[in-house]
Design a protein with these regions (language model features):
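Pore-lining transmembrane helices
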Residues: 1-193
Length: 193
């Protein structure tokens, strides 16, 4: 318990159970919330530890692989976390769930930074200074509609992640912690964690 992916799955199960029960009785106002709360709590209680253990195991594998092979590991982690950051899911939650630390967390931070700064710079002509700040210090998630229309605009950020990820892990030995691994330049948290 206490892990973002486990909480998401528990909430999803609660929503589905609530949808199944809703509209079936005359006392829906009582039955539906009770079923949602109980099913979500049970799912979180019983599935949460296994989900948490699986995520920690995956995180340990990632941490070990980047430590053993900082060039290849740096490329993979940097590119994947940069992509995750830009998608409408929480890269910080994934970094925390996996427990990314050390060189792997540093490479993940660089991947997130490449996407945020990359999109901020390439969209400057249209978005001016406000867009530069919103995407550079906020989130590159603002570009999801543009990526859906033209996925090629993602290539410069992905390529820069692939180049700078191993630079951070193999040459500069940049390290971070689980929270900083998924933050990128958002509020400049990733660099200082």
């Amino acid at each position: 318990p206490g892990e973002p992916l486990g909480a998401f799955i528990a909430a999803y199960i609660a929503i589905e159970i609530g949808a199944l029960v809703s509209g079936k009785t005359k006392v829906d106002i009582i039955v539906t919330p009770v079923c949602c709360i109980l099913s979500g709590a049970a799912a979180g209680y019983f599935a949460g530890p296994y989900i948490s253990a699986a995520m920690k195991f995956i995180g340990q594998l990632v941490n070990i692989n980047v430590d053993k092979s900082p060039i290849i590991g740096g490329i993979v982690v940097s590119v994947l976390m940069g992509i995750i950051l830009t998608l409408p899911i929480s890269s910080a939650a994934i970094g925390i769930s996996m427990g990314l630390t050390g060189l792997a967390a540093g490479a993940a931070t660089i991947g997130c930074c490449c996407n945020m700064i990359g999109f901020a710079v390439i969209s400057y002509r249209e978005n001016k200074f406000g867009g530069l700040i919103a995407q550079g210090l906020g989130t590159s998630m603002l570009q999801v509609p543009n990526i859906v229309r033209n996925p090629l605009i993602w290539l410069p950020a992905i390529i820069s992640s692939a180049i700078l990820g191993p630079v951070s892990s193999a040459l500069l030995k940049m390290v971070s912690n689980p929270v900083g691994s998924g933050m990128g330049t958002s509020g400049l948290v990733g660099q200082f964690m």
